[in-house]
């Protein structure tokens, strides 16, 4: 059941139920954050209090310009269209949560703070989001060592009860996710596009219905691929996990490189990098930047992986919890 606060966040900050030819544009993250602080400090105190308010009331209480108040009021007027589209999504197994929900992933609040996505669309078991696990990232094009490593990590997660986090794309993501599910484990895919399309295959649908898989995205469920979205979701993979393993990275370009270097700099979680004789140049450079070498072949049994990662981790930087609910 969508709370009134979440309804307002969806109306103001998503394209759900917004006509393609509409002159209105949803608020961006940078626009929403200062507005959220204004709402909290005002007599409204919560987003839900904006429902049913006039332009003049919004303008006065939040001390906005005429243009800003009209934009908010216009976005808030499509409640019926929002409800209709949410019903359609629910009928195909897609649901939504927002930063106003208490069950929103705490690790995003803790690590990303005001960069936390306002809205998450998901299919499957949302309780998996933020459970102990390993993020596996890398190129779509892998050599044999990379393929073996991705499969090994997926199997290890499945057999040791850890969630396998990935981006749900071809290559590393698919290999590791399939291995985790085949080992009767669980997996989370943070998608950059096409959630509606991703849930259609029967094997994916079965895993979603069993509660072994959750697919989530901060983007519209029917959004097509864009480089910007793919780059933007990389941090969302890392920030749910306890550890990250980079299987293969290009040097100083691409989403894998960007996500790994950002995580190393921010110190969200320990970053391991696959090390082997024919590893790509990007792996070499990530090791120089502070990544921890992950050996191939792994010298221990599958069930030793969690213990090995813990023993070989560099302590991540302490993170202050974001206190705001929305």
Give residue ranges: language-model regions:
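Long amphipathic alpha-helical segments
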Residues: 1-80
């Amino acid at each position: 059941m969508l709370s009134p606060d979440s309804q307002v966040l969806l109306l103001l900050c998503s394209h759900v139920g917004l006509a393609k030819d509409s002159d209105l544009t949803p608020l961006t993250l940078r626009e929403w954050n200062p507005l959220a602080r204004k709402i909290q400090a005002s007599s409204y105190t919560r987003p839900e209090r904006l429902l049913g308010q006039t332009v003049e009331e919004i303008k006065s209480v939040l001390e906005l310009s005429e243009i800003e108040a009209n934009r908010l009021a216009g976005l808030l007027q499509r409640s019926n269209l929002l409800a209709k589209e949410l019903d359609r999504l629910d009928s195909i197994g897609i649901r939504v949560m927002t930063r106003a929900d208490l069950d929103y992933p705490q690790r995003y609040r803790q690590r990303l703070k005001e960069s936390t996505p306002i809205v998450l669309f998901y299919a499957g078991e949302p309780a998996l989001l933020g459970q102990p696990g390993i993020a596996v990232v890398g190129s779509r094009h892998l050599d044999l060592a990379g393929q073996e490593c991705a499969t090994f990590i997926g199997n290890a997660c499945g057999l040791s009860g850890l969630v396998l986090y990935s981006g749900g794309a071809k290559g590393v993501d698919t290999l590791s996710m399939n291995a985790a599910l085949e080992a009767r484990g669980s997996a989370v895919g943070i998608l950059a596009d096409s959630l509606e399309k991703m849930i259609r295959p029967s094997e994916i649908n079965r895993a979603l219905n069993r509660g072994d898989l959750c697919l989530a995205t901060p983007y519209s469920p029917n959004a097509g691929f864009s480089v910007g979205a793919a780059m933007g979701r990389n941090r969302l993979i890392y920030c749910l996990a306890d550890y990250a393993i980079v299987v293969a990275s290009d040097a100083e370009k691409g989403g894998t490189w960007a996500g790994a270097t950002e995580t190393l700099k921010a110190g969200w979680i320990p970053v391991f990098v696959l090390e082997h004789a024919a590893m790509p140049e990007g792996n070499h450079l990530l090791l120089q930047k502070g990544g921890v070498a992950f050996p191939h072949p792994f010298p221990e049994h599958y069930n030793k992986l969690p213990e090995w990662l813990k023993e070989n981790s560099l302590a991540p930087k302490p993170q202050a919890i974001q206190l705001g609910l929305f």
